[in-house]
Curated annotation (Swiss-Prot):
It comes from the Eukaryota. Residues 736-756 have a biased composition (Low complexity). Belongs to the SMEK family. Residues 1-100 form the WH1 domain. It comes from Tetraodon nigroviridis. Serine/threonine-protein phosphatase 4 (PP4) occurs in different assemblies of the catalytic and one or more regulatory subunits. Regulatory subunit of serine/threonine-protein phosphatase 4. Residues 721-730 have a biased composition (Polar residues). SUPFAM superfamilies: ARM repeat (SSF48371), PH domain-like (SSF50729). One of its GO terms (cellular component) is nucleoplasm. The lineage of its organism: Eukaryota, Metazoa, Chordata, Craniata, Vertebrata. One of its GO terms (molecular function) is protein phosphatase activator activity. This is Serine/threonine-protein phosphatase 4 regulatory subunit 3. The gene is smek1.
Length: 818
C-alpha cells in the first residue's frame, strides 16, 4: 500500500469546545501491526516526531468539511481534526478512510454520529430515503413538520441532510422566501424560519457552504428575522447593509481574503445575534458551525500574516506624521481588533502572529502612538500593549532596554505607560488599574528569563530603577511634602493607593534594588504621611507598605526606621483613631504584635525607649505591655548573661518532656474545678499563666465606657507630644541600669520561674519569664489580643492585697503574652 503524504495541521477539541493546534506535519495511511489495521499517521515537519497515530476504525464516524477538513471522534470526549493545505490531499485521505470502512467517498459522513436502538435502526435502514415534499407555498407546513420530526434521530437527520443537499432545496426555499415576503405571508414566513433553523441543526458542512455563500447568506439572515415567538420581525439585514460598514483602512488586494472576512463577520453575526440561544442539546448540534467560524479565523490571520505589503503599509501609515487623525484612529482600531482576533487562536498560531507583528515593528509604532494627543488613539494603543505584555513580557522588556540607550527617559515606552496611568481621567481609574497590572507583570521576577550569558532580572530591574521608578513615584513624592497629604481627594487617593500597591509588590520581590531606592529617597517617611489621609483605604495601604518592610526583618530597614523615628506617624494615627475598633486599629496593633512575637530586638527597644509614655495606658490588648516585657528581658540578659544561659537550659529541659506528660498535665488542668481553689490560689499550667473566667466575661459595655473616659487623656498625651524633633522625641524615656518591673507585674511573691509551676522567681526579677513561657491561657485555651479590664471592686481588692504584699487572686494575675 503506497503512502500518500500531505501537509496538515492536527487539532483536538478541548473542554471549552475550542480547537487546540497540536502541530503541523505530513499525513500518511498504512498498516500498523500494533493496531492490526490501517491507520492515519502524522509526523511533524520540524523533527519527524509522531503527532498522530490513529487506527481507521470501521465504526468511527468521519466527516469531511469545507473540502480541506476531516473531523472524527475517537472517544466520548476526544474529537480530532486534520486541516489539509491542499484539497487533493484531503480527497486522497478521505478515499482511504472510505475504502477501509466500505463507504462511498462522495458522502461527507461515513457513520451515524449517535447509536440508536436496534428497532429504530432496523426501521430506518429498511425504509427508503426521505422524500421531501415539493417546495411550494401550500406545502411549507408539511416540510416544517418533517424537519422537526427528523431532528431527534441521527439517521433521519442524515437522510434529511442528504435530501436537502442533493435536491438543491436551500435555493428553492430562499426563492419561496422572497415570494412570501412580497405577499406579506406571515404564516409562510414563520414556517420558513422553522425550516431554516432546523437545517442549521443538521450540523452539516456542505449545507453551511451553500447557506453562507455570497448569493445566499443575506437571504438566510432574512429568513431568520421572522421568529414566530416575536411580535415583530427583526431588522438584521437592515443593520448589516446600512449600519455595519466594512472599512478597508489598508487596501486588501487579495479578493479571497476580502470575501473570507465578509463571510466570517456575517456568520459570527448569525451565531451571536440571529440564531436563538441554543439549548444544551442544540449546542452540541451546532458544533460544525463553531468549527466553521474557527477555521475561517485561522485562515484570515494566516493570510494577513503572509501579506507583507499589507502589514508594512499598516505600520508605515500608523507612524507617519502626515497621516490625519481620523485615518490614524481607524488604523489603530483595526490593529486592536486584529490583536483581539488573535486571542481566539491556539498558542502555536498566536506565537506566529505576535512574532510577525514584532518583526514588523509594533513596539516602536506603539511608542509613537502613545506620545500623541488623541485620547482615543492612546487608549486603543494601551489595549494593544496589554495584548503584547500578556503574550510575551520578555519581548517588551528587551525592547525598552534597547531603546533606553537611544532615547530620553521622557519618551521611553514604559514611562509613557506610567504617565497615562497617572493622567487617567476616569473617576474610577479603570485604565490606571489595567496599566498598573501590566507594570506588575513587567517587573515580576517570576516570569523573567535567566540564561548562561545574561540574567534578565538583573538587567531589567537595574534599568527600571534607573529610568522609570522616579516617574512612578513622582505623584507620591509631590503629595507628601508636608505632615499630611497635599491633595486628599478620592481620585488622587485611588492613584496613590495603586502606586503603593506596586511599591509593596517591589518590596516583596526586588530585594536590594527597592531597598536602596527606599533608603536613599526616604520613601517610607513619605509613604507614612498618607496615614493622615481621610481615606481609610489609602492609610491602610501605607501601613501595609511599612508592614511588608518590617516583615523582611532586614536590619538595614530597621536601622533606617529607627534613625528617622518612622514609628511616630504610625503611633499618631493609632492615637488619633481613639477607641474606634476598625481596620486601622487592627492593622497597627498587628504590626506591633509582629515585632513582639518575632522578637525583633532592635525595633522592640526603639519602640519602648521612645514611645512607651504614649502606649502605656493601652490596656485592652497585651501587645504593648508584652513589648515592654520583651524589652526588660533583653536588658536583663544584657546585665546578667549567666541568668540567660540558665533560662536556656531550663527551656530546653521543658521541651524534652514527652507528649504523654503534657497530655496528663492538660487533663489534670481541665479536671480541676474552679470552686476547689482557695482564695489567692493560682492554677498554672507548666508553661503558661492562667486567667479566670471573670476576666473574660466582664461586660463589653463597661469596657467601652472606660475607653471613652480615657479618650480625653489619650488626646491630651498626643497634644503634649512633639513629633517634630527627631533627635529628641518627646516619648523617649531614660532607663537606668537597674532592672525595671513591668507595669503589669505582680509582687515578687507572686512571680513564677519558667522552670516549674508555683516556684518563686529569682530575687528582684519581678514577673519575668522566658519568651517561650508567657502566653496567657484560660481553661478554654489561648486568649486573643483583647484583654478586658477587671471591675472596680476587684481593683479595690487588688489595691488592698498589694499593700499587704500577698499573692494576687487569679483574676489579677499578671497578663503576659509572648
Amino acid at each position: 500500500m503506497t503512502d500518500t503524504r500531505r501537509r496538515v495541521k492536527v487539532y483536538t477539541l478541548n473542554e471549552d469546545r475550542q480547537w487546540d493546534d497540536r502541530g503541523t506535519g505530513h499525513v500518511s495511511s498504512g498498516y500498523v501491526e500494533r493496531f492490526k489495521g490501517t491507520s492515519l499517521l502524522v509526523r511533524a515537519e520540524s523533527d519527524g516526531s509522531l503527532l498522530l497515530e490513529s487506527k481507521i476504525n470501521p465504526n468511527t464516524a468521519y466527516q469531511k468539511q469545507q473540502d480541506t477538513l476531516i473531523v472524527w471522534s475517537e472517544a466520548e470526549n476526544y474529537d480530532l481534526a486534520l486541516s489539509f493545505q491542499e484539497k487533493a490531499g484531503c480527497d486522497e485521505i478521505w478515499e482511504k478512510i472510505c475504502q477501509v470502512q466500505g463507504k462511498d467517498p462522495s458522502v461527507d459522513i461515513t457513520q451515524d454520529v449517535v447509536d440508536e436502538s436496534e428497532d429504530e435502526r432496523f426501521d430506518d435502514m429498511s425504509s427508503p430515503g426521505l422524500e421531501l415534499p415539493p417546495c411550494e407555498l401550500n406545502r411549507l407546513e408539511d416540510l416544517a413538520e418533517l424537519v422537526a420530526s427528523s431532528l431527534p434521530s441521527p439517521l433521519r437527520r442524515e437522510k434529511l441532510a442528504l435530501a436537502v443537499e442533493n435536491e438543491g432545496y436551500i435555493r428553492k426555499l430562499l426563492d419561496l422566501f422572497h415570494v412570501c415576503e412580497d405577499l406579506e405571508n406571515r404564516e409562510g414566513l414563520h414556517h420558513i424560519y422553522e425550516i431554516i433553523k432546523g437545517i442549521f441543526l443538521l450540523n452539516r458542512t456542505a449545507l453551511f457552504e451553500v447557506m453562507f455563500s455570497d448569493e445566499c447568506i443575506m437571504d438566510v439572515i432574512g429568513c431568520l428575522e421572522f421568529d414566530p415567538a416575536l411580535p415583530q420581525p427583526r431588522r438584521h439585514r437592515e443593520f448589516l447593509t446600512k449600519t455595519a460598514h466594512f472599512k478597508e483602512v489598508i487596501p486588501i488586494s487579495d479578493p479571497e481574503l476580502r470575501q473570507k472576512i465578509h463571510q466570517t463577520y456575517r456568520v459570527q453575526y448569525i451565531q451571536d445575534m440571529v440564531l436563538p440561544t441554543p439549548s444544551v442539546f442544540e449546542e452540541n448540534m451546532l458544533s460544525t458551525l463553531h468549527s466553521f467560524i474557527f477555521f475561517n479565523k485561522v485562515e484570515i490571520v494566516g493570510m494577513l500574516q503572509d501579506d507583507e505589503k499589507f502589514l508594512t503599509d499598516l505600520f508605515a501609515q500608523l507612524t507617519d506624521e502626515a497621516t490625519d487623525d481620523d485615518k490614524r484612529h481607524e488604523l489603530v482600531n483595526f490593529l486592536k481588533e486584529f490583536c483581539a482576533f488573535s486571542q481566539t487562536l491556539q498558542p502555536q498560531n498566536r506565537d506566529a502572529f505576535f512574532k510577525t507583528l514584532s518583526n514588523m515593528g509594533i513596539l516602536p509604532a506603539l511608542e509613537v502612538i502613545l506620545g500623541m494627543d488623541d485620547v482615543q488613539v492612546r487608549a486603543a494603543a494601551t489595549d494593544i500593549f496589554s495584548y503584547l505584555v500578556e503574550y510575551n513580557p520578555s519581548m517588551v522588556r528587551e525592547f525598552v532596554m534597547q531603546e533606553s540607550q537611544q532615547n530620553d527617559d521622557d519618551i521611553l515606552l514604559i514611562n509613557l505607560i506610567i504617565e497615562h496611568m497617572i493622567c487617567d481621567t476616569d473617576p474610577e481609574l479603570g485604565g490606571a488599574v489595567q496599566l498598573i497590572s501590566l507594570l506588575r507583570t513587567l517587573v515580576d521576577p517570576e516570569n523573567m528569563l535567566a540564561t548562561a550569558n545574561k540574567t534578565e532580572k538583573t538587567e531589567f530591574l537595574s534599568f527600571f530603577y534607573k529610568h522609570c521608578m522616579h516617574v512612578l513615584s513622582a505623584p507620591l513624592l509631590a503629595n507628601t511634602t508636608e505632615d499630611k497629604p497635599s491633595k486628599d481627594d478620592f481620585q488622587t487617593s485611588q492613584l496613590l493607593a495603586l502606586i503603593l500597591e506596586l511599591l509593596t509588590f517591589c518590596v516583596e520581590h526586588h530585594t536590594y534594588h527597592i531597598k536602596n531606592y527606599i533608603i536613599n529617597k526616604d520613601i517610607l517617611r513619605r509613604v507614612l504621611v498618607l496615614t493622615a489621609s481621610k481615606h481609610a483605604f489609602l492609610a491602610l495601604c501605607a501601613l501595609r507598605f511599612m508592614r511588608r518592610i518590617i516583615g523582611l526583618k532586614d536590619e538595614f530597614y530597621n536601622r533606617y526606621i529607627m534613625r528617622n523615628f518612622l514609628f511616630e506617624p504610625v503611633i499618631k494615627a493609632f492615637l488619633n483613631n481613639g477607641s474606634r475598633y476598625n481596620l486601622m486599629n487592627s492593622a497597627i496593633i498587628e504590626m506591633f504584635e509582629y515585632v513582639r512575637v518575632e522578637d525583633v530586638k532592635s525595633l522592640t527597644a526603639h519602640i519602648v525607649e521612645n514611645y512607651w509614655k504614649a502606649l502605656e495606658d493601652v490596656d485592652y490588648v497585651q501587645t504593648f505591655k508584652g513589648l515592654k516585657l520583651r524589652y526588660e528581658q533583653q536588658r536583663e540578659r544584657q546585665d546578667n548573661p549567666k541568668l540567660d544561659s540558665m533560662r536556656s537550659i531550663l527551656r530546653n529541659h521543658r521541651f524534652r518532656r514527652d507528649a504523654r506528660t503534657l497530655e496528663d498535665e492538660e487533663e489534670m488542668w481541665f479536671n480541676t474545678d474552679e470552686d476547689d481553689l482557695e482564695d489567692g490560689e493560682t492554677v498554672v499550667r507548666t508553661s503558661d499563666k492562667i486567667k479566670t473566667e471573670e476576666d473574660l466575661m466582664e461586660p463589653i459595655s463597661k469596657f467601652m465606657e472606660r475607653k471613652k473616659l480615657k479618650e480625653p487623656e489619650d488626646k491630651e498625651i498626643l497634644a503634649k507630644s512633639s513629633f517634630s524633633g527627631r533627635q529628641n522625641p518627646s516619648f523617649k524615656l531614660a532607663f537606668s541600669g537597674s532592672t525595671k518591673t513591668s507595669l503589669s507585674s505582680p509582687p515578687p511573691s507572686a512571680s513564677l520561674s519558667p522552670g516549674s509551676p508555683g516556684s518563686p522567681g529569682s530575687p528582684g526579677s519581678g514577673a519575668r519569664s522566658s519568651p517561650s513561657n508567657t502566653s496567657v491561657t484560660t481553661k478554654g485555651g489561648l486568649v486573643g489580643l483583647v484583654d478586658y479590664p477587671d471591675d472596680d471592686e476587684e481593683e479595690e481588692d487588688d489595691d488592698d492585697e498589694e499593700s499587704k504584699e500577698e499573692p494576687l487572686p487569679p483574676s489579677k494575675k499578671s497578663r503576659l503574652s509572648s
